[in-house]
Amino acid sequence: MSSASKSTPSAASGSSTSAAAAAAASVASGSASSSANVQEFKIRVPKMPKKHHVMRFNATLNVDFAQWRNVKLERENNMKEFRGMEEDQPKFGAGSEYNRDQREEARRKKFGIIARKYRPEAQPWILKVGGKTGKKFKGIREGGVGENAAFYVFTHAPDGAIEAYPLTEWYNFQPIQRYKSLSAEEAEQEFGRRKKVMNYFSLMLRKRLRGDEEEEQDPEEAKLIKAATKKSKELKITDMDEWIDSEDESDSEDEEDKKKKEQEDSDDGKAKGKGKKGADKKKKKRDVDDEAFEESDDGDEEGREMDYDTSSSEDEPDPEAKVDKDMKGVAEEDALRKLLTSDEEEDDEKKSDESDKEDADGEKKKKDKGKDEVSKDKKKKKPTKDDKKGKSNGSGDSSTDFSSDSTDSEDDLSNGPPKKKVVVKDKDKEKEKEKESAASSKVIASSSNANKSRSATPTLSTDASKRKMNSLPSDLTASDTSNSPTSTPAKRPKNEISTSLPTSFSGGKVEDYGITEEAVRRYLKRKPLTATELLTKFKNKKTPVSSDRLVETMTKILKKINPVKHTIQGKMYLWIK
């Protein structure tokens, strides 16, 4: 307006008053037009304010609110993370403490620790768009937006007035990946499969086979199976803290897992045939590892003993292993195994024993006949005193199995020159002696063979000694000469036979050098043992016994006990229930 008033004088210098009047008229018309166009609005700030937040999305996400049909917005539940490492103790019932939370809070306040309470409104937002298959966003609160400025949202009230609400929080929404990320091990496994090619023909065949199986099933059975699967899905027992974990996630994860399983089945279908052999070998190795036994010599707590796998015991050298190396472990174990497992051999041995007994009885009868003939000759011929002396000396010489011919000749010379008849009798006796010694050696050899193959009963040894005694001349066994000095040499052959035989045949006890039936039973009740392990148990005890003798006595005891036999990894284990 000032520019107009200044220009008017330059245009018309004579009429200044008229120009001023025209300017005043124009100002009045402008004010009237401005008052007619201005609108006034009343803005109310309500006393009960509603909280309004701003959702900020990135422009690259191409979010269009108009296209959203199914939207769900909820707070994230971080109760578990907030609690952290604190123990979840029950507030009531078993294991609870009265007013534990209050006492814990008071204790913390004493030390100046003020715990922050969990605020659900401070947690980030979770936005789900489009249901199960739709997108998922997480809104994180941004700070510092409303520090230097105040932002309001204007809304129309029903009475026409405008209500202003301040904006409290700004949230930046970013998309969440719906798929499950792989762990380090899974990623490595998948990386190993990167060069594998999918065989879609096998997948198609599987689908066809599944379809055929479904057709074969009755419709009623299929309905029952579906109902059972639905029930299992419907029933879910969860904590109250997990109320935010929705079913949508679980369903989507289930679908993804199914797809993965189908792919893995198709990939692993070819490798199954090759993998079976390797799996069998691994199982065998595991079985070998499982067969570690606890070593304990004490008999305490036998019922409570357990077998544990120990790797440390394998590294340390075992003292019993050294003893096993020194001993003839393999041969003995094989021999014992044959003895314990072969029932057919036992039958053969029984038959052989019976035949030996029959032979011995036949020899006895022959000897008795010979004795009768000798006694008849004696009755017919009346010998002189010198002859009697010669007979007694001859019989004394015949009683000893280990006397030489030179001693016989010396005794005969000292007693005087014998007659021819006596010499004939002495020759007959020598022949009988040779027969008896041969028969006794046969019996001993047969019994020793039986002892090697199976434990021989001590009755054989006593029978052999009885045969010897019965085979002696009738003069020595007669009751008339029992008080005479000739009766004493009759006891010598028995003792000599018993010393020549091993303890197992001479009727001696098995417990002579520490191997008792009770000890063997105790070891076998404790845990299963191989034959060599059982032998080492007794070999460790410092006993001056040869390994052959040890094996003989052990076989005898094992035959009596008759333990249970199990072959594990080619080894035979013995144990008693």
Swiss-Prot record:
Q: Which GO terms describe its biological process?
A: positive regulation of transcription elongation by RNA polymerase II; transcription by RNA polymerase II; transcription elongation by RNA polymerase II; transcription initiation at RNA polymerase II promoter
- Here the segments flagged for biased composition (Low complexity) are 392-406, 438-456
Enumerate the CDD domains for this protein: TFIIFa
Origin superkingdom:
Eukaryota
Main localization category: nucleus
| Chain residue ranges for the region called Disordered | 1-36, 236-508
Question: GO CC terms on record?
Answer: nucleus; transcription factor TFIIF complex
List the cysteine pairs that form cystine: none
Q: How is it modified after translation?
A: Phosphorylated on Ser and other residues by TAF1 and casein kinase II-like kinases.
**What Pfam families does this protein's entry cite?**
TFIIF_alpha (PF05793)
Q: Which family, according to UniProt?
A: Belongs to the TFIIF alpha subunit family.
Designated name of the protein: General transcription factor IIF subunit 1
Taxonomic lineage: Eukaryota, Metazoa, Ecdysozoa, Arthropoda, Hexapoda
Q: Which gene encodes it?
A: TfIIFalpha
